[in-house]
Swiss-Prot record:
PANTHER family (alphabetical): LARGE RIBOSOMAL SUBUNIT PROTEIN BL17M, RIBOSOMAL PROTEIN L17
Family: Belongs to the bacterial ribosomal protein bL17 family.
A Pfam family reported for this protein in Swiss-Prot or TrEMBL: Ribosomal_L17
Domain of life: Bacteria
Region annotated Disordered, chain positions: 136-173
Acidic residues bias spans: 138-149
Name of this chain's protein: Large ribosomal subunit protein bL17
Source species of the chain: Bifidobacterium longum subsp. infantis (strain ATCC 15697 / DSM 20088 / JCM 1222 / NCTC 11817 / S12)
GO MF annotation list: structural constituent of ribosome
GO CC list: cytosolic large ribosomal subunit
SUPFAM superfamilies attached to this UniProt entry: Prokaryotic ribosomal protein L17 (SSF64263)
GO BP terms in the entry: translation
Quaternary context: Part of the 50S ribosomal subunit. Contacts protein L32.
Family annotation (HAMAP family): Ribosomal_bL17 (MF_01368)
Length: 173
């Protein structure tokens, strides 16, 4: 028998827990959001995010690894085509857990787990602009130093000429 994870299990056996999480992940990818208890949602989140990361890779090995968990081929197809395309710009945080009112029958803490579909803020563009500005700053002092050297040479010559000029003026007096 496989050793269970630390802490209480969601079901009576590890196999039942794996099947329950696989079924919830399938429902999540089919519908975009599901309502469940808070502990189940917290256990589902890492699994769902890992499966979406595999889907973003998009290769055959990743598809086979996802098929180990999600047995429904149509859901895997949706995951690899639609959901992975939506999450392409996002680097994690693909799901959101929102607590809702306790369940009516037994007052169990309920939650909604859903896929995050809002577009990602344009932080990548800002980072690229900052990187370009940093490169421009590094190049600017080099160009400025060359320009300074070019302008300093005449100043030194002028100082030498000025030093000679007072000496000539003293001789003239």
């Amino acid at each position: 028998m496989p050793t269970p994870k630390k802490g209480p299990r969601l079901a009576s056996s590890p196999a039942h827990e794996r099947l329950m999480l696989a079924n919830m992940a399938t429902s999540l990818f089919q519908n975009g959001r599901i309502t469940t208890t808070l502990p189940k949602a917290k256990r589902l989140r890492p699994l769902a995010e890992r499966l979406i990361t595999f889907a973003k890779r998009g290769d055959l090995h990743s598809r086979r690894r996802v098929m180990r968990v999600i047995r429904n081929k149509s859901v895997v197809h949706i995951l690899f085509t639609q959901i992975a395309e939506q999450m392409e710009q996002r680097e994690g945080g693909y799901t959101r857990i929102v607590k809702i009112a306790p369940r009516v029958g037994d007052a169990a803490p309920a939650a909604v787990i859903e896929l995050v579909t809002e577009p990602v803020a344009k932080k990548a563009v800002v980072k690229e602009a900052e990187a370009a500005a940093k490169v421009a700053e590094e190049e600017a002092p080099a160009v400025e130093a060359e320009a300074t050297e070019a302008t300093e040479a005449p100043v030194e010559e002028a100082a030498a000429v000025e030093a000679e000029a007072p000496a000539d003026a003293e001789k003239a007096e």
